[in-house]
Amino acid sequence: MSALPHFPLAAVVGADELKLALCLAAIDPAIGGVLIEGPRGMAKSTLARGVADLLDGGRFVTLPLGASEERIVGTLDLDAALGEGRAQFSPGVLAHAHGGVLYVDEVNLLPDHLVDLLLDVAASGVNLIERDGLSHSHPARFVLIGTMNPEEGELRPQLLDRFGLKVQLHGTPAPSERAEIVRRRLAFDADPQAFLIQWQGAQQALQQRCVDARQGLAAIALDDAALNEIAERCHAAGVDGLRADLVWLRAARAHAAWRGANAIEAQDIEAVEHFALAHRRRPAPAQSATPQQPSSRQAQAPSNASNGEGQWGELPAQNVTMGERRQLPGWPKKP
């Protein structure tokens, strides 16, 4: 049974920033994946599926809802290890996603340790399984795409920082764009093959551009001039750690390859700045309120304690009339 066709990325209306970020992650998966933040109905999953068609394998894997750690990383058959002297590995989601796209919907609702695991493998490109003294590893290079709706919860800052790029979708498209989006969706649903043929030229041009960019990526140097510029900007943005510098530099190189250039230029650094700093930039500290000056009436209050008022805010001493001292009768002496 053939897989259902994906809506071509070239036919998506608008969302230019998100399409660029996804293409950069497809060019260099070492960037660390893309986090898409936005409400429902913004074509996040459609765009993620479209990225898979830009990769060599074209594989698109969705993380099942409620998947356990063993389902994600795979399992080792200990009984086979004892009987045959070797570990038998059953592949998990990460093995199936190798060479393609791993899509995690509502990543902010996953347990933190699973998000951490996914980010570790996405960054290293290797999945290592260790159980009871046995270990197995396999390559797991994929483009990690996570989506989240901020109304349903946030990611911890430590996990948020580990996503390479972040794109925030907000606002509603113009009426003309809305109509065109619906028109293209209806055409695709009515006859997917005819729609794919209609957009075949634009889709193939986009695929070839990504292929050329991946092939030319290694020839573009991560030069000191670009690194120094990025380091200055990260410092000015108050970014914690060095992950932003590394991701920004890699994304700028991928953007240069996307343009077909041979070196990183200022326009490449500018083009990806928001993607790298959107979730890492620290807000400027709020200015402290100016201390209130005492009123003129308070300032003119006499401070001489001899006038009976003492310091401002203190009540003057009051003379309290005391009654006569009573003499208690003494105890009678013992006879």
Model-derived segments and spans:
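Dynamic helix-loop-helix/coil hinge segments at AAA+ ATPase domain boundaries and subdomain interfaces
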Residues: M1-K19, A237-G238
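Conserved alpha-helical scaffold flanking the Walker A/P-loop in AAA+ ATPase domains
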Residues: C23-A26, A81-L102
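Walker A/P-loop
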Residues: A26-L65
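Conserved Walker
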Residues: I31, E37-R40, L82-V93, V107, ...
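C-terminal engagement/docking regions of AAA+ P-loop ATPases
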Residues: A43, E232-H235, D240, A254-P335
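Conserved AAA+ ATPase "SRH/arginine-finger" region at the nucleotide-binding site
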Residues: V61-G66, K166-S176
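Conserved AAA+/SF3 P-loop NTPase catalytic/coupling segment centered on the Walker-B
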Residues: S68-E69, A95-A122, E154-L160, P175-R178
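Basic, amphipathic alpha-helical bundle interface domains used for macromolecular binding and assembly
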Residues: V115, P173-A179, R185-R282
